[in-house]
């Protein structure tokens, strides 16, 4: 497709209409590169994608994609073994999260049958392990403390040191208030300093870092905090080094998956682009045109996309029809009609919806040529006629039977008689070459050419003689007429002058009467068609209303189901939590034996309200619908026996699943858990406690990992963990506390010594963690 036609018809302005609907930089790049296609299968595929997106919006009105930055350059840097910065990693994290969201969204789609988009959704891949690691990068582009134990240690020390410095300086603010120009702690070169009056600079021992512009204030770092500030400086350097190490580790994690991540990013961008095309179609009442197998064109109520209030027109360019000649005076909208045809064809061949009604049809041309407007070249000293003729010669040399040619005011700019003859000769050459052509002209001679020549049709633009203004309605099959006599009469020209003028052109009066009759017949036909279209629109509105009511009912039903499940779970959780509290108090007060606690707990658990939903037909139907989809890695689940939430991490060869439930890794069969709906992820989650799956003696021991925890948090988790282990009759458990500063390890030891249900405990063997882990025997 030649690029000049894109400039002449302002195709880039059409693309700008799509831009506001795009959310991702990838889709913006795809839009900027969009050009008309010349292969029907590719165009058909683009149209099928829009149809698929329409189905999605019928089921999910608010379907959308989060804003995503382009990651193409970041992925190239990874391939070159470079490390990414925090913002680049955050952009990739968003792509991974969005990919996972799209996969879950697709898996939950009901009542949708795709033609093209299914392959995109199915080619998306998710990375649960990578997503888990990247939780250490928050949405603000900051590394969280838990990114590594070392980073947490450094930041904890940094916080403590900064607190001590502030405390010392706060005390000095009170003690030395009379020596200070301001009662505040300032900062100079990253060091905490005090603003001291210059006259008292020798009263405070320390390091001078700055002097105010007036010289009245000296910024001194008191000697009491110099060492601490040095420590803070070193800790900040350590923090930067550890952050760089973590970013390097994250970059290494991503490197093996660059190709897949790039493909995911492209798919997300393309889905966003298809979504934008659908929204453009919906907002502008556009349509997906059919693609003709020949050169047939049929545009129903087609509109110019760049005009604010365009008039809709019908245009039919049948296979046998070679040329349409629009005749009549200027200012009637002939050029607009010419451009409307060209833009509709460019949009359709670019895979964009066309501003027309359903049933419209486009052809597929290898090239579209146009000579529109005054393109004379001052530099080449060419007249208007010479400029047009130079361009026309170029078009005639390049056009073939797979081309569409558009001429505006063909033959203008020279002697009318010669110009009309040239116009007819050019049209005849194109007709004999079987090249589809639309041309506008004000030469009356071309009316006769259109009537007398096979496969050529006249057309005109309607003119309202009452208001003396054009209506911009296209009348195919009706030649144009000047309406000069009617206009002159209505403007007050003497009747005898008008009569004399008519007598001078008597030879044309019969033709004008015929044209007038054709116009009347065309208007009557159009009125009837408009009435039929109104009835069709009423039917469409009714169908949409019914479909909307059905979707609203389905949505409300789903909300009620979720509410019922949530309320039932809250009742059970509340009862179990109360029982835990009661047993803990009994244990603290009465020295109950472990088996007595377990028996009592089991009895109280039986008292938890049981919500019998087995006879609820709506819930049973919902369960069947949910069960229709098999679980996948990354799915959120609820363990049926404990009511705890977790995530599926892998599937074993025997069909069982491994799941991470809090701090515990569990092996489950499919009937031991239920999938959590994606929508439930947005709900406020009930408070959960860590649980231990009951294991037989031959299975792996339960393990609690306290590394990276605060002391109070670690002790609380340890207490809950031992309690759950006793409840599940576990004989031995592992406690991983690390070595670190030894605070957590010492706390674990103290707790185990005073717990009467701990039979024995000792550090793990050297090859199993050594002094960083403790093996506990319960009894």
From Swiss-Prot:
Class of enzymatic activity (EC top level): hydrolase
Family matches, as InterPro entries: DNA_mismatch_repair_MutS_C (IPR000432), DNA_mismatch_repair_MutS_core (IPR007696), DNA_mismatch_repair_MutS_sf (IPR036187), MSSS (IPR046893), MutS (IPR045076), MutS2 (IPR005747), P-loop_NTPase (IPR027417), Smr_dom (IPR002625)
SMART domains named in the record: MUTSac (SM00534), MUTSd (SM00533), SMR (SM00463)
Residue span, Smr domain: 704-779
Record EC number: 3.1.-.-, 3.6.4.-
Purpose: Endonuclease that is involved in the suppression of homologous recombination and thus may have a key role in the control of bacterial genetic diversity.
Protein name: Endonuclease MutS2
Gene it is expressed from: mutS2
């Amino acid at each position: 497709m030649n690029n000049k036609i894109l400039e002449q018809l302002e195709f880039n302005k059409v693309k700008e209409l799509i831009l506001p609907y795009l959310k991702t930089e990838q889709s913006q790049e795809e839009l900027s590169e969009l050009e008309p296609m010349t292969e029907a299968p590719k165009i058909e595929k683009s149209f099928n994608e829009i149809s698929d997106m329409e189905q999605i919006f019928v089921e999910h009105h608010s379907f959308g994609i989060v804003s995503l930055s382009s990651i193409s350059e970041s992925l190239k840097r990874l391939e070159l073994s470079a490390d990414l910065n925090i913002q680049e990693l955050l952009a990739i994290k968003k792509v991974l999260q969005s990919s996972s969201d799209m996969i879950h969204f697709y898996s939950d789609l009901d009542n949708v049958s795709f033609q093209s988009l299914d392959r995109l959704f199915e080619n998306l891949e998710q990375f649960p392990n990578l997503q888990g690691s990247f939780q250490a990068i928050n949405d603000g582009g900051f590394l969280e403390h838990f990114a590594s134990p070392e980073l947490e240690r450094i930041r904890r020390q940094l916080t403590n040191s900064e607190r001590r410095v502030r405390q010392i300086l706060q005390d000095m603010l009170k003690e030395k208030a009379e020596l200070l120009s301001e009662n505040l702690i300032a900062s100079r070169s990253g060091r905490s300093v005090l603003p001291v009056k210059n006259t008292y600079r020798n009263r405070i021992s320390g390091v001078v870092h700055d002097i105010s512009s007036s010289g009245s204030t000296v910024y001194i770092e008191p000697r009491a905090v110099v060492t601490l500030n040095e420590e803070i400086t070193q800790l900040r350097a350590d923090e930067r080094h550890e952050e760089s190490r973590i970013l390097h580790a994250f970059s290494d994690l991503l490197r093996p998956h660059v190709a897949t991540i790039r493909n995911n990013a492209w798919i997300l961008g393309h889905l966003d682009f298809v979504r934008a095309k659908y929204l453009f179609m919906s907002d502008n009442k556009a349509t997906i045109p059919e693609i003709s197998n020949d050169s047939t064109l049929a545009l129903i109520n087609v509109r110019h996309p760049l005009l604010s209030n365009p008039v809709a027109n019908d245009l039919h360019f049948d296979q046998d029809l070679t040329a349409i000649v629009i005749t009549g005076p200027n200012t009637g909208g002939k050029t607009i009609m010419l451009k409307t045809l060209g833009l509709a064809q460019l949009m359709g061949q670019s895979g964009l919806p066309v501003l027309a009604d359903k049933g419209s049809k486009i052809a597929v041309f290898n090239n579209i040529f146009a000579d529109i407007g005054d393109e004379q070249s001052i530099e080449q000293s060419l007249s208007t006629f010479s400029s047009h003729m130079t361009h026309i010669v170029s078009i005639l040399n390049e056009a073939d039977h797979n081309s569409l040619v558009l001429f505006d005011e063909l033959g203008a700019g020279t002697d009318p008689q010669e110009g009309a003859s040239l116009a007819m000769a050019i049209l005849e050459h194109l007709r004999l070459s079987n090249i589809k052509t639309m041309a506008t002209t004000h030469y009356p001679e071309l009316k006769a050419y259109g009537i007398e020549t096979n496969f050529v049709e006249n057309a005109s633009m309607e003119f309202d003689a009452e208001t003396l203004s054009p209506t911009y309605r296209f009348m195919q099959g009706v030649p144009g007429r000047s309406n000069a006599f009617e206009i002159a009469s209505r403007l007050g020209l003497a009747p005898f002058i008008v009569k004399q003028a008519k007598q001078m052109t008597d030879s044309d009066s019969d033709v004008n009467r015929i044209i007038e009759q054709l116009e009347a017949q065309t208007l009557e036909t159009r009125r009837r068609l408009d009435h039929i279209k109104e009835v069709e629109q009423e039917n469409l509105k009714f169908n949409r209303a019914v479909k909307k009511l059905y979707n609203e009912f389905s949505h409300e039903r789903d909300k009620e189901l979720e509410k019922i499940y949530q309320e039932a779970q809250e009742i059970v959780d509340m009862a179990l939590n109360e029982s835990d509290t009661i047993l803990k108090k009994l244990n603290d007060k009465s020295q109950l034996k472990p088996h007595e606690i377990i028996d009592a707990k089991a009895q109280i658990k039986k008292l938890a309200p049981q919500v019998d939903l087995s006879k609820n037909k709506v819930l049973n139907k919902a369960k069947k619908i949910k069960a229709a989809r098999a679980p996948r890695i990354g799915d959120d689940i609820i363990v049926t026996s404990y009511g705890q939430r977790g995530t599926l991490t892998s599937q074993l060869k025997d069909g069982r699943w491994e799941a991470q439930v809090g701090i515990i890794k569990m092996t489950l069969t499919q009937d031991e858990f239920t999938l959590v709906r994606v929508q439930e992820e947005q709900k406020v989650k009930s408070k959960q406690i860590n649980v231990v799956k009951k294991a037989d003696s031959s299975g792996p021991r339960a393990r609690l990992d306290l590394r990276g925890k605060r002391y109070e948090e670690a002790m609380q988790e340890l207490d809950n963990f031992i309690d759950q282990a006793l409840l599940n009759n576990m004989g031995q458990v592992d406690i991983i506390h690390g070595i670190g500063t030894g605070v957590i390890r010492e706390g674990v030891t103290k707790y185990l010594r005073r717990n009467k249900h701990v039979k024995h405990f000792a550090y793990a063997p050297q090859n199993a963690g050594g002094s960083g882990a403790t093996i506990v025997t319960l009894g």
